[in-house]
Amino acid sequence: MEEETETRVFLSNEQHQEEEEEEEEEPSLPRSMVISLYLGYFLARWGARTWEFSVALYMIYLWPNSLFLTAMYGVVESGSATLFGPIVGQMIDGMSYVKVLRLWLVTQNLSFIVAGGAVVALLVVPDLKSQNFPVFATLVVLTNLSGAIGVLSTLAGTVLIERDWVVVMSEGHSPAVLTRMNSVIRGIDLSSKLLSPVITGLIISFVSLRASAITFAAWATITVWIEYWLFISVYNGVPAIVQSDERRSLRSSQSQAEETDSASSFYVPLLHEEESYRNTQSRSRILRILERISESSFVSAWRNYLNQEIVLPGVSLALLFFTVLSFGTLMTATLEWKGIPTYIIGIGRGISAGVGLAATVLYPLMQSRISPLRTGVWSFWSQWTCLLVCVGSIWVEKEKIASYMLMAGVAASRLGLWMFDLAVIQQMQDLVPESDRCVVGGVQNSLQSALDLMANLLGIIVSNPKDFWMLTLISFATVSLAGILYTIHLYRIRKHLFHLEKIPLLNNFFAS
């Protein structure tokens, strides 16, 4: 089994040169459709990344000197994704692409409009918490729920585009096409992560928080129509996507037919054995309950995921979400509390995303030479090394210097982080069957959200920004665990970690 896995992982790289020679004979992807896909994805990710950055600033403003509201939002968002992520993946599998697009885009943008409106209402009356706490609490809950629904619907779009459409569009082409599309998609996400915080930070610093919330709601209102038009154009313009949609519909109808046959075969014997049924009625009820639980969407999705060959890389990637060492809500709120200007935080987040963009350029070059599997291990431990700077900042007495060390360590680590992310995603695309892609993608995102939820729960427990150093150490320990798991996966497949005989200093030792 391990030898087969190694063969499958390295197959695309072993044949890379031969397929490059045949690339000219392959049908090329319609350029206009690829551009439409990228542009639609950019618009969708811009809104999601803007909200991701802004919500932490809104919450720390509404409840100063505490990470409580910020962490509470994170708990609601991550909790919803954890509970419903696998179900979202199965829903996508059971729906046509057009229905998924409508559900994703309408739900995401409508939720963001409501969240932006609720924030504006909170900011219009600065003393609302003391004047009318029930109204304040209601608006905060509305912000949390609508924001969480928006992020959950974004999950559907991420699974659809990153895990399905990109793979379908690249079928019949050389592996380099899939690698390039993965890199561009990740680059678009990181570009949004780079630019949206900078622009939002400038609006907040030089205009107002209220203006940023109004701008965000207006963006969601306008772009939903453009996004739908772009994605529908891609659907209609790429035959491979239409054919994949037809295969999905066929699988769905066959699955329903099998369930019907199974139900019939279960009940027919019962009609002929009524007396036996009465004697074992209570036991049958228990068995039926257990069967329903085992056959539920949630359990079957997780069972599917755990049976995949890439489960260890997936868990390693998910563990990286159990961290505050990113420009997420908790770290952003802490930096704001420490007195770092909002536009500086936005620029720092932008630099971090810029470093991540470099990963999308470096990854295709690296994986073509040493495979996605080995690229993953090298990129992971380079990220880990950069995070040592964040750990070192704990013992720096000057708060401003410590804050800038924290930001620098996080920003530098993004190169390794996003290369590792790309390496794991490509392994999933290579090794997960087409029929399981959306389900596995949904569970993967759910697992990531579960770990993110745990990080936010820690933020509630350790809500004083002065104690952020505790969260830093816990996060670093979790990242280390993720690296160990991925290294174990590498060793299981390759039976070794390094080619020690290729190291000059050890060459004589092996020769002797």
Curated annotation (Swiss-Prot):
GO terms for biological process: cellular response to iron ion starvation; cobalt ion transport; iron ion transport; nickel cation transmembrane transport; nickel cation transport; transition metal ion transport. Disruption phenotype: No visible phenotype under normal growth conditions, but plants have increased sensitivity to nickel when grown in an iron-deficient environment. One of its GO terms (molecular function) is iron ion transmembrane transporter activity. Induction: By iron deficiency in roots. InterPro entries: Ferroportin-1, MFS_trans_sf. It is a multi-pass membrane protein. Residues 1-28 are annotated as: Disordered. The keyword Membrane applies. One of its GO terms (cellular component) is plant-type vacuole membrane. The chain crosses the membrane at residues 55-75, 105-125, 133-153, 187-207, 214-234, 310-330, 343-363, 376-396, 405-425, 442-462, 468-488. It is found in: Vacuole membrane. It comes from the Eukaryota. Coiled coil: none annotated. It holds the Pfam family FPN1. Residues 17-27 have a biased composition (Acidic residues). The keyword Membrane applies. Keywords: Ion transport, Membrane, Nickel, Nickel transport, Stress response, Transmembrane, Transmembrane helix, Transport, Vacuole. Vacuolar transporter that is involved in the transport of excess nickel into the vacuole under iron deficiency, increasing cellular tolerance to nickel under iron deficiency stress response. Plants over-expressing IREG2 show increased tolerance to elevated concentrations of nickel. Belongs to the ferroportin (FP) (TC 2.A.100) family. SLC40A subfamily. This is Solute carrier family 40 member 2. It comes from Arabidopsis thaliana.
